[in-house]
Regions:
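Glycoside hydrolase catalytic-domain context in secreted enzymes
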Residues: 1-476, 480-584
Length: 584
């Protein structure tokens, strides 16, 4: 419908170009999920990467999406960095070969087909070795090292594989933000690598010149520097209204030229032309049911997973397992959890867990978690042991809360949920720009603001409600967010996670008394980009006693530990390389 509107009802009839994340599968709930990039690197087989790219492209184009923000070609030189799993590791040669193979699979021989997409490489460049492993921090590499180790990976993808576009990175190199680096974005990218398409800034990377790097005095100067350097497309830096206003101002005062604006426009139009969108902007609607998560793609995902498993040690020839084993304990927080890796959605189809796979291989009936041994199979016992982070926070349900009345916006005390007041800026001064009813406090605002009225760069939220638990129990109440949050109950500050020096993700003991009304106030400030905002509870501390007992009683214990979406991914950087949370 959107494409039809653009083509048939706008003045110039220029088709839309839709993009999506597709790091190891299209970012859709029904799409095939392939192994994460770091896992792919373990096979050392570019052909597998090309196969994956080809299948991801087919599923993507079948959904009328034309460009993918993939692959990630950063060299991960600091394992504390939360995005390490998105890369092919630290090696320039291996990353070059695997990245180029994915690009060839995605783009094929011709972009203007119903099974190919444009590849937008990221994050150009030097992004994978930030100071302290902190996402978006300046790189520890100097310019010489970036050109020696990082740039050849992108060169291979552009020059040898023909990648179309790129997303420039957040970081600075020797104090100069990449987003305003003319040599990197124009001289090398267009002059040497001959990239045919456009440069997109990473999300808010342009405005970060003003807010983080402090290399631009104003948002306008930040935009001007980016345009001059060779950035063609913004990514949620400015509202459309502000973007147009600033562009007009800069054209009027000579900060940028019409030639520069025309050049950026032509680059975007060129990509649309390469994709064949002017001739055929629509998709064959029968393709989706035939292609997305089809049997061929499922089989290939399984093959890749099997070929990328890495055995670090086989002490005392433990593998293959002896058929004489009669009791197996499957333990750990990841044993019955499908760990898919960052940048994929939770699938709407069933994903087989380690526990389920072991039971299937051994012929244990699927309906039983614990099954006694018999002649045909051993006994399988399972226990989670612990939550990775100790507190498995569950968002509090809306029917536990009655909103605080706001007659002016139609909120009454009989409404379930929270009265939410949104303020632009770093505090709660002035009047809220938006007051609404929020059913829960369970948000992810990294990709979009809560509302068009809210400034995604800096805003605060105050939620108020009366809480009444449907039953009495001893548990814990708390917050989960990398941003600033605090919790008040009956006017008392219960959790203080306000400011960069404090931790908002906390759980505190709390007795939920049935029938008692608690006055609740939760406050939030997006000083870490709003990737996770939760107000919730759990039923108290867990115990590992059962897991220990199972391990002692069994002939073999298979323990699944490690990271999860709670501990690894964008903005989940590490201070230690120990097993996270309570697993040690």
């Amino acid at each position: 419908a959107l494409q039809k509107y653009a083509k048939e009802q706008t003045r110039l009839g220029i088709p839309f170009l839709f993009h999506e994340e597709a790091l190891h599968g299209l970012h859709r709930r029904d799409a095939t999920i392939f192994p994460q990039q770091l896992t792919l690197a373990g096979a050392f087989e570019p052909a597998l990467c090309e196969d994956m790219g080809r299948m991801v492209a087919a599923e993507t184009r079948a959904k009328n999406i034309h460009e993918v923000l993939a692959p990630v070609l950063d060299l991960a030189r600091d394992p504390r960095w939360g995005r390490t799993e998105e890369t092919y590791g630290e090696d320039t040669y291996l990353s070059s070969k695997l990245g180029a193979a994915v690009v060839r699979g995605l783009q094929g021989e011709d972009l203007a087909t119903d099974h190919t997409v444009a590849s937008e490489l990221k994050h150009y460049t030097g992004y994978g070795n930030p100071i302290g492993g902190l996402n978006c921090a300046p790189t520890t590499m100097g310019r010489h090292d970036v050109f020696s180790y990082c740039m050849p990976v992108f060169e291979e993808a552009f020059v040898k594989a023909g990648a179309t576009d790129t997303m420039c990175s957040y970081n600075s190199i020797d104090g100069f933000p990449v987003v305003s680096d003319h040599e990197i974005l124009t001289d090398v990218l267009r002059g040497t690598y001959k990239m045919p398409g456009f440069v997109r800034s990473d999300m808010t990377a342009i405005i970060m010149q003003h807010t983080a790097h402090h290399s631009a005095a104003t948002p306008k100067e930040a935009l001007q520097k980016a345009v001059k350097a060779g950035v063609d497309v913004q990514f949620a830096d400015y509202s459309h209204e502000e973007y147009r206003r600033l562009m007009k101002e800069m054209l009027a005062d000579g900060s940028i030229t019409m030639e520069e604006l025309d050049t950026s426009t032509a680059r975007v139009l060129r990509v649309k032309d390469m994709l064949g969108l002017f001739e055929n902007p629509y998709v064959d609607e029968t393709l989706e049911s035939k292609v997305v998560h089809c049997k061929e793609h499922q089989d290939k995902a399984l093959e890749i997973a099997q070929k990328t498993v890495v055995l670090l040690k086989n002490e005392n020839n433990m593998l293959p397992l002896s058929r004489s084993i009669r009791k197996i304990a499957v333990l750990g927080p990841n044993a019955n959890l499908p760990v898919m890796g960052d940048y994929c959605m939770e699938p709407d189809y069933h994903a087989v867990t380690l526990l389920e796979g072991i039971r299937e291989v051994l012929g244990v009936p699927a309906e039983n978690v614990e099954t006694a041994a018999n002649a045909s199979h051993p006994e399988i016992v399972y226990d989670k042991g612990c939550n990775i982070l100790g507190a498995e926070i569950k968002p509090l349900e809306r029917w536990w809360f009655n909103a605080k009345p706001r007659p002016a916006v139609g909120i009454t005390e009989i409404d379930y949920g929270f009265t939410a007041e949104y303020f632009n800026g770093a505090d709660f001064s002035g009047e809220p720009v938006l007051t609404r009813l929020d059913s829960q406090i369970n948000f992810n605002w990294i990709y979009h603001a809560p509302d068009d009225k809210v400034d995604s760069r800096q805003f605060c939220v105050r939620w108020t409600a009366t809480m009444c638990s449907p039953k009495s129990f001893e548990g814990r109440i708390g917050l989960s967010s990398p941003d600033s949050m605090r919790l008040y109950i009956d006017g008392e500050l219960v959790i203080d996670g306000w400011g960069e020096d404090k931790e908002a993700s906390q759980m505190v003991p709390f007795f939920f008394e049935s029938g008692r009304k608690y006055d609740v106030r939760v406050e939030f400030r997006n000083d870490a980009r709003g990737v996770r905002v939760i107000f919730g509870y759990d039923h108290g501390e867990e115990t590992i006693d059962r897991a220990i007992r199972f391990a002692k009683e069994s002939d073999l214990a298979i323990v699944a530990l490690g990271d999860s979406t709670e501990t690894s991914g964008e903005n989940f950087d590490r201070t230690t390389l120990n097993l996270p949370g309570k697993q040690l």
